[in-house]
Each structure stands twice: as structure tokens, then as C-alpha cells.
């Protein structure tokens, strides 16, 4: 019988005392629940001086923002912990460290990152971290290369694909990215003023064919162990540092999905900046976002190709020029998935603060409309946008 029970703050303290690796566990005396996501309880555990020393995270058996009417598997906690452990192995400087995991309690203890800030909040506040995009590109190159066919023996790769099978969480992604925004659904969430724009998504045959192709690639292309939800709210930043967290959507899928989701969130910030900062002040920040996108992709591509040249184990995949050709396909996928992220965050269940916190209704609606229009263009034109420079030109065109 499972010993699962929902943690209280007292439980979190007792658990951290046992598993957080603190030299003097009795110094841990209090906890505060700080989770602002949709799926989990998250506790900060404090010492006697009020300093946060560890994080205790527990999966809930339902979607928190909906309630018990939307049940979820607790096995996602195992998948998150194992994904983060695997990613830490390949990119320790950019992945949160897991101290302990218990599959029956669906709980993990991880390093405290109180000296970092959530990147999304910093982007909204126009606090610039010039190294962040390059570090994110390096993280993605390291973890995606080292869990791909370029590096893993075929037997090991197939074993890992089975280990990280994540059907319940993938189903959520499939619905929120590729189904809900293109049909009338109770989970969709958008202002009535955008009804005409959203109805146009449902009626666009060319768009829906392109979305179907993206969904099929999400199903069928087990290229590497993805983070699965790598957006600016699942990344912590500090001066000179970046750490990825929240990997419960981890599974083996198309590399372009992680790249596209990351770029998509930078573009969501781009779309929201006029409402956050005012049109005049937003101009420079928007150029920074475009520069971030350029740095993210070029760092990822250069690092991935360098790793491929040095470490590819398969003789056929090591043939000169193949890694470069492979990345062209990854790029096309990334552009399409980027567009789907823009649309689902504008009309679907889960929005982003970059736009939702804009106070002026008319401006907020215009920023949402911009994201929808841009997302649609990127999905439909993905195969023709053949470089990051071409992507940035398209973004400027739709501004």
C-alpha cells in the first residue's frame, strides 16, 4: 500500500532534516509553501536564522489549478527527478541538484536557489542577464546531445526511451499545444474581444495541417531526453548563473521542441513588452530579446556540432556534414513548435505573466493578438524560415 500523503510544512521540515544533506539538520526549523505552478507543492525550508536552505517538492495527484476533477499520475515525480539527475550529469552548472527522491511519496529534496531569480520575472521587469541566453543554449546542447543517438549506444538509447516514457504528461502537452487552441474547448481561456482571431485559428486548414505535422513529430521522434517544458518560468538566473528546474514533462522527443519552447517564451516576452514598459521604452528591450534568441540558437548549434565532431559514436552519424544537416531539421521543428507555444499561451489554459499582467485591457488584447498572429505565421512558414536571422526578420515584419 502506498504511503503517499499530502505534505504539510511540518512534514517538509522533517523530511529536509533527513535528506537535505545539511551538516546540522536540527538547524532546519520551519517551512513555507511557495508553489505558484499548476501541478505541485513546493516548500522552502528555513534554518533558525530564517535563511532558506533546501527545497522540498511534492507532486499532487491532480492538476492544482483545476482541482481533483483532473487527476494526474504521481509517477511524474519519478520522471522529473530522473530527468533532472540525467541532465545534471551532463550539465551540472545549469541544472538544479537533486539531493533525494522518494517515488512512493512523490517527493524530492533539491538545492535551494534563493540567490537566483525566476527568469520570467526578471524579463518582465526589464532586468537583463547578458549571459543567460548563451547559458541556456549550452545547457540544451549538452543535455540533448548526450541523450541522443549521436552519443548513446542504440541499446542504451532504447532502454532510456522506455525508462522515460511519460504518456500522462505528454497527453497534457498534446492537448494544450496541438488540440485545444484549434477547437472549441472548455479549457481555452481568452478575452471575448479576441473571438474573431481565435475562430480564425479553428477555420484555417493550412494552419491545422501544419499543427498536425508538429503533433506527429512530437509523437514519433524520440531524438533526445527533453526537459519538456523549458520556459522562462522554469529557469532560475543570477549574475553569471542559470539553472533549469521543473522537468516533470521530461521524455524522449524531438530536439526542436525544447528549442522552440524556449524561443517561444522569449517571443512572448517580446510581444508583451509594449504593455509592460510602454511603446517607447520597449524598443530597446525588444532588441535585447531578439539578441537573446540569436545567442540561444547560435550557442546551441555551435556547441552541438562541436560535441558531435568530438563524441559521435555511430560511424554513419559521424560522417562529415551530417550533424549540420540534422540541425537544419531541428531548426525547422523549433520554428514550428515556437509558433505553437505562442498560440497556446495566448488562447489556451496556461498563459504567461509577460502578457497577462498588463494592466491596460486594450494593450493586453493587442499583445495577445500579436502573439497569435506571429505564432500562426511561424507554424505555417516554418519550412521556409531557414535561419535564425530569417526568423528575426519575420518577427520584425510582424511587429
Swiss-Prot record:
Q: What is its EC number?
A: 2.7.1.100
Can the keyword Kinase be found in this entry's annotation? yes
Q: For this chain's UniProt record, which GO biological process terms are given? A: L-methionine salvage from methylthioadenosine
Pathway named in the protein's UniProt entry = Amino-acid biosynthesis; L-methionine biosynthesis via salvage pathway; S-methyl-5-thio-alpha-D-ribose 1-phosphate from S-methyl-5'-thioadenosine (hydrolase route): step 2/2
| Binding-site list for ATP | 40, 57, 111-113, 246-248
What's the subunit arrangement here?
Homodimer.
Functional note: Catalyzes the phosphorylation of methylthioribose into methylthioribose-1-phosphate.
Q: What is this protein called?
A: Methylthioribose kinase
| Protein's organism | Klebsiella pneumoniae (strain 342)
Gene for this protein? Answer: mtnK
